[in-house]
């Protein structure tokens, strides 16, 4: 039997991604540094962007969908006067404008971009169109016609105006919201054009900048051994934002072995914030997280167990 390559390590590492690297480049580099068998990231960042890139190792990869569904916090710099084909500073200029909106004009336009909105992704994105990546089509001169997609924006505020050509915005959003599209569209709504000149991700689900380390701080030991797993956060860290449900040892054992538990046995313990018809909880056996469980049809069912 072919032996699997790498060490079976489990946990999360939050990298402060430098500008110029793709998210895949960062994952591959970190995976080599730790000699890890299995790794993946919790949400793509554009190459231009900096900030939080959570990387899951081993069992933590089971919790990636919950990180990707979590709230993200960003700050981006809008450069006014030039539209670019990529909607960021790396693209070619396709349109210019001399209009420079006032702060009041921006603030008047912002409410239309908050809440549940429809958003057209950038043509340079990883979305597939008839089996092809949109960015591959765009690079070949076949700009894809991308339909609007649902997006949720919880916060979108103007936070600084360094000069007439530049505006800085803070955003909190759900999964799959493109900052480049927000920048493009807020400029259009104010009668001008613009693109993202800088972008930083400040938070992903339960992870904040306090959890992040720089990529160049991960170095092999003197004997060239892999980086220490002591740098990793526990697998359960990713689930900190999900309401906890206290279980008996017997209930935890049943769920861990794939068996459902009746909600009638859990009455009075289900957190108020959880929908008993379709909610997700973090199952706790004492201080130990056993995994994620779903409330469904009168039962608590195992969803992703650790």
From Swiss-Prot:
CDD domains: PseudoU_synth_EcTruB, PUA_TruB_bacterial
SS bond partners: none
Endpoints of the signal sequence: none
Catalytic residues of the enzyme: 46 (nucleophile)
One function term, GO molecular function aspect: RNA binding
InterPro entries named in the record: PsdUridine_synth_cat_dom_sf, PsdUridine_synth_N, tRNA_psdUridine_synth_TruB, TruB_C
EC number: 5.4.99.25
GO biological process: mRNA pseudouridine synthesis; tRNA pseudouridine synthesis
Protein origin, superkingdom: Bacteria
Catalytic activity, reaction form: uridine(55) in tRNA = pseudouridine(55) in tRNA
This protein's UniProt keywords: Isomerase, tRNA processing
Family: Belongs to the pseudouridine synthase TruB family. Type 1 subfamily.
Function: Responsible for synthesis of pseudouridine from uracil-55 in the psi GC loop of transfer RNAs.
Name of the protein: tRNA pseudouridine synthase B
Species: Gluconacetobacter diazotrophicus (strain ATCC 49037 / DSM 5601 / CCUG 37298 / CIP 103539 / LMG 7603 / PAl5)
